[in-house]
Amino acid sequence: KYDVIFADPPYDMEPERLERLIGMVFERNLLSEEGLLIVEHSSKVYLEEVPHFQEERRYGGTTFSLFNNE
């Protein structure tokens, strides 16, 4: 299991595919108990409703969405 997973998929990836990618990390139990998944994506995409969402940090056109096991 991993403490940190950083995903940097293509910026033009559809939100549905991003949600599937996030879901796979949790379905396959890849994170340690206190682990963190960080997904870099366009600020035009909002992932707050995706399960395991913790917070986001926006930097201009780039957003980092953070997910954990809680």
What annotation goes with each model-predicted range?
Residues 1-70:
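Class I S-adenosyl-L-methionine-dependent methyltransferase catalytic core
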